[in-house]
Amino acid sequence: MHFNPPLEPATLIKRYKRFLTDIQLPDGSERTIHCANTGAMTGCATPGNTVWYSTSDNAKRKYPNSWEISETDKGHRICVNTARANQLAVEAIENGTIVELLGYNALRTEVKYGSENSRIDILLEDNEKPPCYIEVKSVTLLDEQVSTKQQISTKQQASTEGQGFFPDAVTTRGQKHLRELTEMVESGSRAVLLFTVLHSGIEKVSAAHHIDAKYSLLLKQAQDAGVEVLCYKAELSSTQIQLKQAVEFINS
């Protein structure tokens, strides 16, 4: 995914009303931009940090600029625009980056499925194999102070370095998606939970049991039923974002 024109830097003043963010431009002027993220954004929205924003050519938009990337005081970059995760996933499937999802001849998005009235993010189809239902989640929570159960049991040293978690807040919607992915597997289809790691400091991913214990339990049950979990990390810059490499999922 390329940004044209390239993203521009500013300083974060505050985020408010869920969708709005005030920033200070390099010339000292202030501007309100759109924030396409209604989540907790833990560690992603610290006032004073650098933000990178895009500019839309849609003249009808009230706020033509969108917050795309945060840059922390440690130099980590985080894509905070939640709409990008699905776009990046589609791009990575189509260009062959996600090798586990090769071999299908059709890709559709936002297809109705399941018994709880959901839409699957990506549906892969092929005449020679069962359909593959893919739910995409964006991972931006880096918490190096929390150990997973697996890390504690194996007494790994410095094992929390680069530890990312999902979700960053209780997600009943995410819980529903896990139930429906499990339902798809039980009906004979393939189901995949794809974590797009959009934080440059995250090197591995776990379910955030300390934040949403029910989600963590449902994810374990989904895996036991046959739902696959894939994690792919993005490279982020002011000119492009691309999913580049697989990272480990640690089942806590």
UniProtKB/Swiss-Prot annotation:
InterPro entries: SfsA, SfsA_C, SfsA_N. This is Sugar fermentation stimulation protein homolog. It holds the Pfam family SfsA. Belongs to the SfsA family. It comes from the Bacteria. Gene3D superfamilies: 2.40.50.580, 3.40.1350.60. It comes from Vibrio atlanticus (strain LGP32) (Vibrio splendidus (strain Mel32)). GO terms for molecular function: DNA binding.
